[in-house]
């Protein structure tokens, strides 16, 4: 794993040696290359962070509406305009669901004390579980295990679903100024609910991409950033999936490795 061992020592000092040893033995602590840049204009950074949050939450709300649809026709621009236009009598709402809610939970924990954030996230999930809308199987499994007394670092199922990825966005935003910590922090966050190296490495990659995108200078194109992160992913199944997904996008026509 390409992370600094001293970083794990700092996490162990707050989360406990048993937690870090358990997660490391199962190869759940991951890291990838997060490009680092000189500080950019503060207003530009705020605008990018706000845009990222708006995009995530809007996508969650629209996706929730789409999941309730009985058709497979997808959404067009008219659908988006109608759903953004406000709730009318007889028209279904477009509320945020568990992915956005847990995004906020992770962000708040990270902005408090990043080294305690995974444990705080687990505590918050238990405390606020009744407010979660449409949580996935992994979150429900984790919640049951936590309520039965499992430690936060051993409560998650071996899932590699995508429900932890919105929280990875929170890591990338909250720790954008600490690129050397982002991968490990994102993998620890994901491990709270998804005890699979595939899930935690995916979270590390997404958090790194988000951090690089919001901090990049305006003269640095996305095509120079994303492939660098993807190429540093260690698990072939994660790296290959991302390469295949992005290869058809003209923005990422450069080699990934």
Say what each PLM segment does.
Residues 1-257:
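Structured, active/binding-site neighborhoods that engage oxygen-rich ligands
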């Amino acid at each position: 794993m390409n992370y600094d061992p001293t970083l794990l020592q700092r996490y162990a000092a707050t989360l406990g040696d048993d937690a870090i040893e358990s997660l490391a033995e199962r190869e759940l602590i991951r890291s990838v290359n997060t490009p680092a840049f000189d500080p950019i204009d503060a207003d530009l950074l705020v605008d990018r962070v706000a845009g990222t949050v708006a995009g995530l939450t809007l996508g969650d709300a629209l996706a929730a509406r789409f999941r309730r649809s009985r058709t497979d026709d997808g959404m067009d621009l008219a659908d988006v305009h109608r759903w953004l236009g406000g709730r009318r009598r007889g028209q279904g709402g477009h509320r945020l669901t568990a992915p956005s809610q847990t995004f906020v939970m992770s962000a708040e924990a990270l902005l408090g004390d990043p080294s305690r954030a995974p444990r705080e996230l687990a505590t918050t999930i238990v405390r606020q579980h009744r407010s979660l809308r449409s949580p996935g199987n992994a979150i429900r499994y984790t919640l049951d295990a936590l309520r039965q007394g499992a430690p936060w670092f051993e409560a998650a199922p071996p899932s590699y679903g995508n429900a932890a990825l919105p929280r990875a966005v929170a890591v990338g935003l909250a720790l954008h100024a600490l690129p050397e910590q982002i991968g490990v922090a994102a993998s620890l966050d994901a491990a709270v609910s998804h005890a699979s190296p595939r899930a935690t490495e995916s979270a590390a990659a997404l958090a790194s991409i988000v951090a690089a995108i919001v901090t990049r200078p305006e003269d640095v194109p996305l095509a120079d950033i994303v492939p660098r992160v993807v190429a540093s992913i260690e698990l072939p199944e994660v790296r290959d999936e991302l390469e295949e997904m992005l290869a058809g996008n003209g923005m990422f026509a450069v080699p990934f490795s």
